[in-house]
Amino acid sequence: VVVIETHVEFGMKPIIVPYDPNYMYPGKHPIYHGASPAAMNILARNKGYRLVVTNDLGINHIYLRNDIALNEIPEIEVATTLTHPKTIASFKSFEEIKDWEFKEV
């Protein structure tokens, strides 16, 4: 089991903020760090894990290795985890940083 916090503000864009060894929160902007849910899902799949559940806001993703309980615990799609009204409202905050440097995965 792997639990990963993501930035739902990034929406379904498969992006990450480039690593900065000197980063200290809040940095240039409170949400300018980390990775999107879509980016983390790509990483997890590449490592042999599947998304099985998130918290209600879609921030905390819980992944399970693909060789464990595959029939009992099915994979869910990232898009289905980003439907809470607060999560949808948070997408607006990405507008403030949308033109900053990101890496697509």
Question: What positions do the PLM features span?
Answer:
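Conserved beta-strand signature within the Rossmann-like core of class I S-adenosyl-L-methionine
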Residues: 1-8
